[in-house]
């Protein structure tokens, strides 16, 4: 083992241990059973199908976890973590949403189930021309109180009626009642129950938490600078894509750029995004209008999404093509392993090394993230928010979470690392600005792009999110300079999988925990292929053309790259003596 690899292994063990013990500080999780089995949720919903006056036998259903994020953010910023956790076990902030639909029937049925309390609400879509009764206010209120008491066990007679609305239709009257009460005597937290009566039938009971309008306005004011900085950073990243496109055009005229590998990279992005969208079954189900074919609705959603997917795919195409051209004019080709990876030549030594180093580097990145977040959490007013939020729901709301998380975060790592490191890092080295500039300048943009992602720690102050992500970007920048592009792509992928399997690892289901561990280990698959291939070749007593202990792919050109050009070493490129 080389000295640098031994140091990487040691750093990964230390940083990984620090990362694991600090997960509760980095991403504290709501103390609720958020990963309830879908069949159990369906059974709970079917027990109350009489509430919607509909036999749901033969209906299709999907379930997903939803969160009232404004309510959660307000609770966290106005009381202690322990108080917030206690309130989450009582208030409708995290809810399981179970939706039923039947082809040809326009009336979708939805149930809301609290992870700890059971059924807390329901809805049955009702057309305006459906006939019904016209009740007076007293009869309507009695019907509402009886339905809520029968199915939820909640006595609304002790709640304050804040609003009543009547909507006169041709064939019935619709009435809406809004009740409120304090969550506890003397508490400033108020629960709200909105009940919709269609004729004489209670068609919706929707609980919520009342968030003070003044707090919402204050949050909107705070977001202006945050959103401006993020927009500027995204503009710079998009400009990098334009620069890569222009350099690609120049390189095509000089015969430096092929189209096969860039096309594979772009196609991979489109495939990963499309497959990720397809695997989010509850979202596809939610968008389905049951008056039309379900397959046609899903196909339309996927096709519409593919239009937006073309932009990141085009950027990857340009990043790969421009970076290959830059590599050909440099004495060290940092894209060979990436090219072999995209061509599925995983038996290559370079791919195997990048897989192992990338996985270890992912643990180091987790340690850097943990240490930086701890430092930022000491800033006055700092807050690390409860999870799950944002991308965490991708894994929680899919029947194939391992596959979805692997595909979705692979395309993210591909787009970002090819842009920030493979293209921008190569370009800065080409301009002779030095290694520090190549590692740090793209990392600053990378950190600013993520300043608006509130699920990243710390949530407050917003600018504190830039520091941990920037430091991780600098780490990956130096890893790119020391090793190659594939190493940082796989490291980014591994780090994301560590983070966003967090809630699945805490599941009570052992199979869910096992699949989460398997998902985290997916970036090691290329290394497993390379090692297994070498073991097979040894059993067949064949000579190994690429000794495992050598980094031959870092010392020269990709044999598949044409034409082979004479190169002049730059001031920041290592010499043969320094590599030895």
Question: How should each PLM-predicted stretch be described?
Answer:
Residues 16, 26-234:
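Soluble extramembrane regions of membrane proteins in the secretory/endomembrane system
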Residues 23-31, 371-378, 534-539:
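Hydrophobic alpha-helical transmembrane segments in integral membrane proteins
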Residues 291-292, 328-354, 427-429, 539-573:
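Membrane-interfacial, low-structure loops and terminal tails that flank and connect transmembrane helices
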Residues 218-409, 413-418:
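Core alpha-helical transmembrane segments of integral membrane proteins
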């Amino acid at each position: 083992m080389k000295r640098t690899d031994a140091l990487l292994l040691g750093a990964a063990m230390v940083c990984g241990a620090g990362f694991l013990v600090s997960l509760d500080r980095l991403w504290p999780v709501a103390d609720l059973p958020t990963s309830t089995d879908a069949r159990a949720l369906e059974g709970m919903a079917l027990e109350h199908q009489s509430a919607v006056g509909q036999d749901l036998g033969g209906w299709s259903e999907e379930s997903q976890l939803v969160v009232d994020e404004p309510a959660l953010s307000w609770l966290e910023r106005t009381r202690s973590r322990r108080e917030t956790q206690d309130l989450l076990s009582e208030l409708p902030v995290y809810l399981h949403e179970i939706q039923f639909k039947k082809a040809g029937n326009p009336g979708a049925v939805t149930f809301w189930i609290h992870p700890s309390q059971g059924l807390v609400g329901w809805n049955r879509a009702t057309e305006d021309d459906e006939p019904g009764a016209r009740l007076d206010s007293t009869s309507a209120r009695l019907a509402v109180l009886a339905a809520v008491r029968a199915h939820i066990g909640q006595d609304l007679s002790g709640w304050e009626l804040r609003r009543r609305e009547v909507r006169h239709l041709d064939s019935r009257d619709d009435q809406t009642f809004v009740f409120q009460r304090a969550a506890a005597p003397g508490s400033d937290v108020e629960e709200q129950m909105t009940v919709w009566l269609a004729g004489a039938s209670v068609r919706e009971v929707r609980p919520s938490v009342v968030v003070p309008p003044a707090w919402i306005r204050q949050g909107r004011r705070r977001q202006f600078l945050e959103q401006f900085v993020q927009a500027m950073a995204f503009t710079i990243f998009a400009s990098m894509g334009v620069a890569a496109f222009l350099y690609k055009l120049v390189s095509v005229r000089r015969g430096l750029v092929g189209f096969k590998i860039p096309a594979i990279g772009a196609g991979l992005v489109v495939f990963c995004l499309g497959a990720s969208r397809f695997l989010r079954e509850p979202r596809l189900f939610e968008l389905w209008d049951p008056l039309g074919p379900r397959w046609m609705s899903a196909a339309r959603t996927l096709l519409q999404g593919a239009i937006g997917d073309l932009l990141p795919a085009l950027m990857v195409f340009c990043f790969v093509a421009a970076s290959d051209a830059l590599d050909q004019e440099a004495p060290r080709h940092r894209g060979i392993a990436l090219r072999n990876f995209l061509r599925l030549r995983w038996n290559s030594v370079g791919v195997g090394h990048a897989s192992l180093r990338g996985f270890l580097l992912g643990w180091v990145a987790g340690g850097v993230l943990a240490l930086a977040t701890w430092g930022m959490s000491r800033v006055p007013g700092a807050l690390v928010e409860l999870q799950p939020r944002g991308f965490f729901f991708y894994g929680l709301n899919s029947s194939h979470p391992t596959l979805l998380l692997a595909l979705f975060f692979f395309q993210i790592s591909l787009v970002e690392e090819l842009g920030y490191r493979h293209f921008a890092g190569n370009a800065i080295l080409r301009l002779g600005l030095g290694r520090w500039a190549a590692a740090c300048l793209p990392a600053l943009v990378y950190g600013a792009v993520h300043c608006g992602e509130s699920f990243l720690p710390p949530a407050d102050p917003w600018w504190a999110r830039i520091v941990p992500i920037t430091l991780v970007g600098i780490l990956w920048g130096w890893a790119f300079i020391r090793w190659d592009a594939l190493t940082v792509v796989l490291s980014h992928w591994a780090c994301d999988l560590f983070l966003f399997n967090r809630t699945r690892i805490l599941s009570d289901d052992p199979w869910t925990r096992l699949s989460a561990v398997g998902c985290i280990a997916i970036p090691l698959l290329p290394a497993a292929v390379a090692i297994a291939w070498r073991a097979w070749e040894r059993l067949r007593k064949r000579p190994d053309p690429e000794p495992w202990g050598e980094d031959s792919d870092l010392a020269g050109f990709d044999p598949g790259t044409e034409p082979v050009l004479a190169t002049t070493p730059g001031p920041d490129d290592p010499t043969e003596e320094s590599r030895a």
